[in-house]
Every structure is written in C-alpha cells, then in structure tokens.
Curated annotation (Swiss-Prot):
Name assigned to this protein: Large ribosomal subunit protein eL39
Pfam families tied to this protein: Ribosomal_L39
InterPro entries cross-referenced by the UniProt entry: Ribosomal_eL39, Ribosomal_eL39_CS, Ribosomal_eL39_dom_sf
Source species: Pyrobaculum neutrophilum (strain DSM 2338 / JCM 9278 / NBRC 100436 / V24Sta) (Thermoproteus neutrophilus)
GO cellular-component term (any): ribosome
BP term (GO), one: translation
A GO molecular function held by the record: structural constituent of ribosome
HAMAP family per record: Ribosomal_eL39 (MF_00629)
PROSITE patterns according to UniProt: RIBOSOMAL_L39E
Family recorded in the similarity comment: Belongs to the eukaryotic ribosomal protein eL39 family.
Length: 51
C-alpha cells in the first residue's frame, strides 16, 4: 500500500485498526466470561477491508 494515503482512507484504516481489538478485561470479568471474544475481530490476511 502506498505510503502517502488520502486522509479519508487513512481515517477508515485507523478506525478498522481500533475496532479490531479484544474486549477489555473488565468486560470479561463483569460478564463472568460470557463475553470473551469480539464478533467483529478480523484477521489481516483472511478477511480484507473494503476501505
């Protein structure tokens, strides 16, 4: 990918990077491990973004 990106694409990629995280530890503790993984997780090689 190009080093110089348009601002809109850069913001979309940054939002996708932020959303691609595990739920916080306090959420796992509060729900008694009912919530342990995020359904929105994405692997960089398997699922490509439409950004």
């Amino acid at each position: 990918m190009a080093r110089n990106k348009p601002l809109g694409k850069k913001l979309r990629l940054a939002a996708a990077l932020r959303s691609n995280r595990n739920p916080p530890v306090w959420v796992v503790a509060k729900t008694k491990r009912r919530v342990v993984r995020s359904p929105a997780r994405r692997h960089w090689r398997r699922v490509k973004l439409k950004a």
